[in-house]
Amino acid sequence: MTKPIPRIGSRRNGRIGSRKNARRIPKGVIHVQASFNNTIVTVSDVRGQVISWASAGTSGFKGTRRGTPYAAQAAAVNAIRTIIDQDMQRAEVMIKGAGFGRDAALRAIRRSGILLSFVRDVTPMPHNGCRPPQKRRV
């Protein structure tokens, strides 16, 4: 059975140009989630719609190298590269997690030239909620 030839101009063919770059966003929120295995940097506008994101894994690091500070710095640079093209001048930074990449990602964000209104630590802390997992015996 032969495949049908898609019509030019049909909606399913995809976009001709990227619609994401058309917006101009003056202020945004940069979320950094730093675990011990990976660092994820997400850039959103003030309403919470994601503009761009990058992680140490998508930046080319695999395995245990994803948890390194250098990988977190590379992920932050990759996420911020797209928002500088969209003229973002101000940003708020929310850092979550206790990984090694949290300071390196913040340093990369500061060097990018975006004016930071505040940096907030939003790491979830239990008020003695769930019982922690059993300690490892090696």
Swiss-Prot record:
It is found in: Plastid, Chloroplast. Keywords: Chloroplast, Plastid, Ribonucleoprotein, Ribosomal protein, RNA-binding, rRNA-binding. The lineage of its organism: Eukaryota, Viridiplantae, Streptophyta, Embryophyta, Tracheophyta. Part of the 30S ribosomal subunit. One of its GO terms (molecular function) is structural constituent of ribosome. Residues 1-22 are annotated as: Disordered. It comes from Dioscorea elephantipes (Elephant's foot yam). PROSITE patterns: RIBOSOMAL_S11 (PS00054). Belongs to the universal ribosomal protein uS11 family. Residues 9-22 have a biased composition (Basic residues). This is Small ribosomal subunit protein uS11c. It comes from the Eukaryota. NCBIfam families: PRK05309.1, uS11_bact. GO terms for biological process: translation. GO terms for cellular component: chloroplast; ribonucleoprotein complex; ribosome. Transmembrane segments: none annotated.
